[in-house]
């Protein structure tokens, strides 16, 4: 039976403002701090006040967050875009009564906040990954071929062999990329690209690909890494694993454009936006950045390019998982559900994947009537390239790692250093 649709969200902007007005008085009485602990009203000057993060941490550490900051409360700070324009940036209290584990293993009370609106800029979860690392001694000019060891989509067929010709030698450490979107692009349009390094500092050559087995065989493509070749899934559509994602690096950095990305393994390639986007945290105040702690985040692999087991990262900012936003996960263990999403959707049980839920639409920070695709960190367990997203329509599905999308990231407020 189809789940009945809830059309009125639990937390309207008006509700959050009303809750905030009540909390202002309560917080001022209890803590003697600014009314900025609740939902903030815009000042006549157009400046949005910053929150007293030390006071908030004290409330959380005392175990009083569920009373002081009930689920759905909005705490507002300021985000400044790369053009210098400032936006009020509400954070929803999605779980006031949580715990967080730090890198030392210490566990403390925590309150989970999630951005109410989508981030300002599109970013790839992962770039197209390299398929071959040029070994010491380089590759001489000449013809090379690869064999397909899998069926994938309409155009990748087992035992088919394709060749390409280097017109000049490729130096040691260069990366070969290509076969982009291979299952959905006819082989006649495939290319191989030779980059000097993983930073893509120089494109040395672009080669056409044709059917044929002339020259030196470099190996056989499988979905996963095989011999000297990377898996065709991340080569063709990007990698879907949170631990090595460009998105993770972006969200956790305040470095300038061109300075926040580093390769996470030998196949990783720089995303297209890395040279033009500064790190996400660069848009926030020093006070907010100082209030953030690296906390344990658990994310499972995909079961295709790896064994699908859990990987632990320690992140200040992280993308939500399916489980955390009250959707039915493909594997349990990527955090616990956040009551905000249960109450916002009105769902009685975790919502099914591949269905559309209008109350899940996340709108743009700058254009607040415009819905955006927002990334989750959960990998599609059945592929080495697709990660889950919530579409601009509210559909919960997957999208290739190479697609540049927005997000509504989260953080945990704790006393951890």
Language-model region placement:
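Short beta-strands within extracellular/lumenal beta-sheet-rich domains
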Residues: 160-164
């Amino acid at each position: 039976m189809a789940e009945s649709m809830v059309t009125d969200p639990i937390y309207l902007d008006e509700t959050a403002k009303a809750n905030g007005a009540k909390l202002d008085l309560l917080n001022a009485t209890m803590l003697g701090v600014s009314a900025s602990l609740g939902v903030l009203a815009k000042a006549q000057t157009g400046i949005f006040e910053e929150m007293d993060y030390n006071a908030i941490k004290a409330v959380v550490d005392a175990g009083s967050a569920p009373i002081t900051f009930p689920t759905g409360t909005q705490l507002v700070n300021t985000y400044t875009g790369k053009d210098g324009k400032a936006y009020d940036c509400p954070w929803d209290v999605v779980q006031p009564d949580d715990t967080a584990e730090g890198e030392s293993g210490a566990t403390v009370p925590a309150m989970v906040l999630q951005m109410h609106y989508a981030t300002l800029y599109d970013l790839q979860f992962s770039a197209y990954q390299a398929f071959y690392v040029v070994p010491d001694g380089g590759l001489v000019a000449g013809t090379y071929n690869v064999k397909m060891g899998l069926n994938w989509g309409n155009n990748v067929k087992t035992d088919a062999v394709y060749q390409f010709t280097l017109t000049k030698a490729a130096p040691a450490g260069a990366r070969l990329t290509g076969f982009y979107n291979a299952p959905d692009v006819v082989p006649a349009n495939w290319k191989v690209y030779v980059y000097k390094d993983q930073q893509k500092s120089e494109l040395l050559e672009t080669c056409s690909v044709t059917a044929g087995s002339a020259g030196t065989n470099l190996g056989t493509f499988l979905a996963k890494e095989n011999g000297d070749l990377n898996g065709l899934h991340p080569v063709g559509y990007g990698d879907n694993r949170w631990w090595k994602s460009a998105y993770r690096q972006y969200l956790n950095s305040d470095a300038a454009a061109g300075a926040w990305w580093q390769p996470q393994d030998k196949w990783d390639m720089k995303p297209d936006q890395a040279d033009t986007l500064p790190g996400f945290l660069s848009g926030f105040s020093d006070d907010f950045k100082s209030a953030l702690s690296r906390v344990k985040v658990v994310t499972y692999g995909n079961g295709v390019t790896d064994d699908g087991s859990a990987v632990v990262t320690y992140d200040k900012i992280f993308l939500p998982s399916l489980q955390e936003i009250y959707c039915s996960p493909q594997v349990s263990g990527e955090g616990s559900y956040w009551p905000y999403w249960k109450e916002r959707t009105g769902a009685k049980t975790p919502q099914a994947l591949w269905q559309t839920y209008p109350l899940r639409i996340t709108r743009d920070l700058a254009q607040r009537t415009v819905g955006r695709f927002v990334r989750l960190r959960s990998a599609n367990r059945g592929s080495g390239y697709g990660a889950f997203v919530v579409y601009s329509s509210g559909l919960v599905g997957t999208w290739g790692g190479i697609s540049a999308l927005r997000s509504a990231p989260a953080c945990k407020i704790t006393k951890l250093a």
